[in-house]
Amino acid sequence: MFKKIAALTLSALAVLTISALGAGVSGRLVIKGSDTMLPLANQWAEDFQKKNPRATISVTGGGSGVGITALINGTCDIATSSRPIEPKEVAAARSRNFVPKEFPVAIDGIAVVVHPSNPIKSLTVDQVRDIYTGKITNWSQLGVKAGRIVAVGRDTSSGTYKFFQEDVLKGAKYRADMISLPSTNAIATTVSQDKGAIGYIGIAYAKSFAKKVKVLPISFGKGKPAIYPSDNAIRSRQYPISRSLFCYTRGNPTGLAKAFLDFVMSPEGQAGVRKVGYVPIK
């Protein structure tokens, strides 16, 4: 009799333990923003939901600016951004009675890519700037035979567009004939199909297109070593075009948003950063 009661008790405890472990957090979380961070946010959402099956997470891109606007308007819980939030966006948030909370969550290197057939071996930051501002229009000006340069970049809603303009172009305007595309994937695809093209994409996309585009080492200037965007070079910021990737919330996060960001910064969440192809923040 006692053995039967003990067995039933143990069974009940086992059920309670399994229920407690499987419960996790619940609710619906909306994440929106950076196209660069889209595969990363999807990876985090997938891994988080495995641990918290009662949580529903919606992840969409559209661009960093789109995500931050959605956060300000209250239509998303977390905005992903490949650039720091701008003062005017903080002011807009304050007008809605909150201050955005910033979370650096990963590190990225913006890879400069060309068609695999292009014989160019490397570029300086100045040369990249001159290409994208229109001072250099033909590959022959750089000593190689690849014809007319077709500059490809993102659209104005993109955080990468703005970061590249500020960090590489030093605030100068993009060349008028640049092909502006709505996604990083579209840039990589275009460069892979056009022998004269050059583009800029997040390192995770460069890795996924490894056999279709050629990643160029970049140097800080003439006479300085050209650095390939390896994980170590990006982490140490030796690679010239490195940056942090961010998540933003409406003030200090609570509930499901806090649980998600705690997961993002955990060893498991940072392992997801490496899995996707970016560089862990810690």
Residue ranges and their predicted role:
Residues 1-9:
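Bacterial N-terminal signal peptides that target proteins for export
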Residues 9-17:
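Bacterial N-terminal signal peptides
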Residues 18-282:
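Exported/periplasmic ABC-transporter solute-binding proteins
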